[in-house]
Amino acid sequence: RQMCIRDRLKGKSQLEGNVILLLIMTITITSFFVEAGEEGVSSTYEPIGAWVADTIVPSTNLVVGASWAHMLAIATFLFLIPLSKHMHLVMAFPNVFFHDMRPMATMEPLQRGEDGKAVPLEDLDLESFGTANYTDLTWRHLIDGWACTSCARCQDVCPAYASGKALNPMEIIHDVRYYANDNYATLMAGEKPEEDIIARFGEDSIWACTTCHACVEACPIYIDHVPKLTDARRHLMMERMEFDEKVEDTVMPLMATIENLESDSNPYGLPSHERGDWAADLDVKVAEPAEYIYFAGCAASFDERNKKVARDTISIMKEAGLDVGILGMQEGCSGDAARRAGNEYLFQMLAETNLATFEEIGVKKIVASCPHCFHTLGKEYKDYGGEDIEVMHHSQLINHLQVEGKLPDPQHDGSVTYHDPCYLGRIGGELEAPRNAIGGVDVETERTGKSSFCCGAGGAQMWMEEHVDDGYDRVNVIRSKEIASTGADTVAVGCPFCSTMITDGLSAIGSEMEVKDIAEIVWEQIKANDAAI
């Protein structure tokens, strides 16, 4: 099988694996001859050794030869372990034991103070940003390099790899180990290698990641692939500010987005004073204390398609009798795109500004319809303050209100499938509330729940230009084909980016399937019930 059936590992070197398998086979076979040469070999406890003794009747020379071959094979195996992927036999346990216990996809601040919190921008004391050299990697990242089993599970689930891009998450982890091997003498001398680890990774790999964390979820020994790429982005974005020619077409649109975030606190570059215009006729509190603050996010504030989702969410909350408000023009971007793009300084500036607004208004409960805002506000802002603020996704609140009887029992028309957003399902751990909120799902996609396939917008990819080679589909098209194959009438989504990407993907393949947010489905049913009465 190792020699002939290699679809998953096509193109990978066979030599190392074959040598190891040969050694294991040698150790196993020679052990039977060693047993056969023992006095009084037991057929009960050593049946194969006893069978060899009775059948082959080994000579003394054969036993001695087998014993030497046995010991040499073991010695060779032990010698090769540190130089091969089989170092995982030693390093897998500490890798699992010391794995990051924080919520998945929670990125590390630029600098932590003695209290464990992020150091404020004005107090930062750093000589460099991000990862450019092997010596910039944390000890946990280094262990990952030696713990990898080369099983390729991460490769198999990576959306960038599936769409033919340069990124292979398994090779990124291999690069960490190979870099150490190649620069061993320099590192042991306590010096910094001249080789740039960013060049080893490849900028086309670094910028292809959607940060969906499917690779992390698939890894049996808790290797964390994504931070190595996002830390490299930090260095490229905050220190070098120059990019390889082969990624310029991909990254340049992102640079315009960063400028928009800096000037207008939204990626579209639209005037910030228009941020709350979508709710002008909804009779909702604006920048006033309320039990629930709906954090619309940039997409729902400025994108016409997603404004409807925001309006329906507010309508649902008011239908349930909740005290709800919005921040209006005082709301700023959560900073997710800036952080995933590598501009950590901008992210921290946006986070500190939003937290100051939350404190001024007295925000205690936030509802977000964007999983990226849900994750960033609820998980990552805690390093900067606001630990007592509860953040929930709108599907969680809707389902809670349905259970309490404040909203009608959930239902939907026609057959419905559901696409799990990465930052809500796999990363956020919320799989049931979205499904329950719409009255269940009639047919699931092939890859669903924590194994769901990315829509292609995460990791700031929404603001980059995706390029694929002939013979490959874009990430959103791959996912849209899976969704269309369910035969459902409607695909429910819980993310504005997923809505955009899947709508485009379905259009590209000529599918007429409808794409609806959870809030849209729920509000349609509420209006239908009211009309029936």
Where are these regions (language model features)?
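Hydrophobic alpha-helical positions that pack around
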Residues: Y418
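Iron-sulfur-cluster electron-transfer modules
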Residues: Q2, D136-G145, L167-I173, A180-E331, ...
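Acyltransferase donor/substrate-recognition loop-hinge adjacent to the catalytic core
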Residues: N399-S415
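Cysteine-centered loop/knuckle micro-motif
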Residues: C158, C219, I502
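Membrane-embedded alpha-helical bundles of multi-pass integral membrane proteins
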Residues: Q2, R6-D125, T131
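Ferredoxin-type iron-sulfur electron-transfer modules and their immediate structural context
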Residues: F79-I206
